[in-house]
């Protein structure tokens, strides 16, 4: 539709990023210096925007004060919040970056920022955008940010293994049983928080394998899927034999990476 350009500045959608600063170490402690270049959509997709989860000592206190990051006690993700995602991302845009944009690969809130970009570019809340553009056309009927109340009983319990090898139920709460998914809420995070089934997720993956189409529903063009899965960052990426694309880790050299797989295999690990 031409609404987004990969190399346009994020500040077009989140103005606070126009005055982004980077935290650097000095003889007296810390300084905040201007960015050398604007943070772009492409950098968000490749995790090279300089955004982290606020765990670095130089910026940890800033994130804690803003109620963001593990230092604030919220874990890495945002699905437990009661404010719209763009309110959270507006606040994030005022915090120091961990590195200059385009100069380091740092995994962090970049994909969450993209969720706000999608909302503002489309004029539609992210949950409705996913439903209208992805879940509905792909007939993914069991995928939500916050499941309807009648579906809550279908959620699996989480278990853990003790050091002694005993299987125990994880404690109740947002980190143990993920009860932050009990809605309704409005912080639809671009980086985490969806609930789905194996069957629904398989349909999404098959769409990607088919070049962006499944059962007559065209979600992405073949050219877009090819662009998304082509190596975009290699020298900055931390794993030998791997590169990072527009959202995926891509296997380039199985021997160097030390794992089985075909060249071009792409994906990313989940987290609970």
Where are the model-predicted features located?
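Low-complexity, glycine/alanine/valine/leucine- and proline-rich hydrophobic stretches
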Residues: 259-272
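Acidic-enriched catalytic cores of C-N bond-cleaving enzymes acting on peptides and small amides
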Residues: 10
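Short, surface-exposed loop or secondary-structure junction motifs
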Residues: 15, 19-260
């Amino acid at each position: 539709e031409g609404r987004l350009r990969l190399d346009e500045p994020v500040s077009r959608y989140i103005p606070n990023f126009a005055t982004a600063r980077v935290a650097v170490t000095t003889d007296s402690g810390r300084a905040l210096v201007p960015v050398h270049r604007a943070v772009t959509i492409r950098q968000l997709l490749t995790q090279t925007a300089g955004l982290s989860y606020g765990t670095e000592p130089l910026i940890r206190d800033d994130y804690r004060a803003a109620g963001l990051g593990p230092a604030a006690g919220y874990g890495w993700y945002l699905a437990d919040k009661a404010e719209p995602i763009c309110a959270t991302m507006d606040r994030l845009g005022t915090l120091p970056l961990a590195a200059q944009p385009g100069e380091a690969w740092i995994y962090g809130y970049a994909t969450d920022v993209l969720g706000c970009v999608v909302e503002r570019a489309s004029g539609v809340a992210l949950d409705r955008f996913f439903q209208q553009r992805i879940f509905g056309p792909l007939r993914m009927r069991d995928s939500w940010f916050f499941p309807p109340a009648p579906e809550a009983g279908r959620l699996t319990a989480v278990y853990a293994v003790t050091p002694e090898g005993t299987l125990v139920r994880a404690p109740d709460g947002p980190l143990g049983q993920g009860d932050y998914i009990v809605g309704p809420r409005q912080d639809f995070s671009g980086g985490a928080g969806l609930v789905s089934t194996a069957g629904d997720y398989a349909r999404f993956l098959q769409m990607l394998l088919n070049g962006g189409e499944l059962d007559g529903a065209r979600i992405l063009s073949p050219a877009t899927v090819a662009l998304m899965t082509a190596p975009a960052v290699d020298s900055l990426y931390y794993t030998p034999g791997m590169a990072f694309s527009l959202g995926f880790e891509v296997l380039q050299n199985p021997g160097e990476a030390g794992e089985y797989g075909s060249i071009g295999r792409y994906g990313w690990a989940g987290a609970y």
